Regions:
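Canonical tetratricopeptide repeat
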Residues: 88, 121-125, 153, 187, ...
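Start-of-helix register in tetratricopeptide repeats
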Residues: 50, 54, 84, 117-121, ...
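Conserved structural position within tetratricopeptide repeats
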Residues: 74-77, 110-111, 142, 173-176, ...
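Structural signature of tandem alpha-helical TPR/SEL1-like repeats
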Residues: 61-70, 97-105, 130-138, 161-173, ...
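TPR/TPR-like (Sel1-like) alpha-helical repeat modules
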Residues: 99-118, 124-127, 227-250, 257-260
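Alpha-helical segment of the N-proximal tetratricopeptide repeat
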Residues: 46-79, 88, 146-173
Length: 265
């Protein structure tokens, strides 16, 4: 991904309410990893971690540099289902020059606790040239008026909390309730996005363009996913089409924000 596309995405996500504060946390983590190894690895708080695990991890980080890796390895054995321990172990390993072991630790974080901020951040660290976090589903409404919309808002809230599995579950439930609803189907497709397998989300979202050619949500989210994928030219085209389908709607205004951010990058 080019530097200009990366800047575009970061600027744009700040303006998207669905992005929450997760972008800042992830960017800070990446920045600290690139700095001098005299500082301990950054602690990335994970609300899904049990309090005693969080405390033990922070104590291990305070032992930097002498005992941190050893303590985190012990914690990994003690807490085999903790993504936070494995995320921080990977950070400590990469700062001591053990890149291969760090990558394995991050893969383990994703495997043992996929529905956690630690798993999302671990995937980010394995893909340092991609945008932070996962593409958000942006609802076209703010207050739900149906069970389907309630599911969509819950899924978007889980995305803000960096809980991708829970978000995907809510989006799939919405699509099951309304199999002909373009917004529910779009959310389900967005929820499938994975940096190791981005084609899966596109394979579900692409056909919706043909099925719902006038659905603004489909065009908007296709453009958003294309930014994450790094295809700026096609992203601009889809976002422009989305805006043309309703420039004054919430999604139309967000499409304009993304397009303006692209001009500044």
């Amino acid at each position: 991904m080019s530097a200009s596309v990366r800047v575009w995405l970061i600027v744009a996500l700040v303006a998207l309410a669905a992005a929450g504060t997760a972008v800042g946390v992830t960017l800070a983590t990446r920045t600290d990893v690139a700095k001098q190894t005299s500082k301990p690895p950054p602690y990335a708080a994970d609300p899904t971690a049990r309090p005693e695990i969080a405390r033990a991890v922070q104590e291990a980080l305070r032992a930097w540099p002498a005992g941190t890796v050893r303590r985190l390895r012990i914690l990994a054995e003690r807490y085999p289902q903790s993504g936070l321990v494995r995320l921080e172990l990977g950070l400590a390993l990469v700062l001591t020059g053990q890149q291969a072991d760090a990558t394995k630790a991050w893969l383990d974080a994703e495997r043992v606790q996929p529905d956690s901020p630690s798993a999302v951040r671990a995937q980010d660290l394995r893909h340092p040239n991609t945008p932070p976090d996962l593409p958000p589903f942006v609802p076209s409404f703010s207050q739900p008026t149906s069970a389907v919309q309630a599911r969509l808002l819950r899924g978007a809230a889980f995305q803000q909390e960096l809980r991708p599995v829970s978000a995907e579950r809510e989006f799939e439930a919405a699509a099951a309730l309304a199999p002909a609803n373009p917004e529910a189907l779009t959310a389900a497709a967005v929820g499938l996005y994975d940096k190791d397998r981005p084609a899966l989300a596109f394979s579900h979202l692409g056909p919706l363009v043909r099925r719902f050619p006038h659905a603004q949500t489909v065009r908007f989210h296709l453009g958003l996913l294309l930014i994450y994928f790094g295809d700026a030219r096609r992203a601009r085209r889809e976002l422009a089409l989305a805006r043309s389908q309703g420039p004054r709607t919430p999604l139309g205004r967000r499409a304009y924000t993304l397009l303006k951010a692209g001009q500044k990058s």
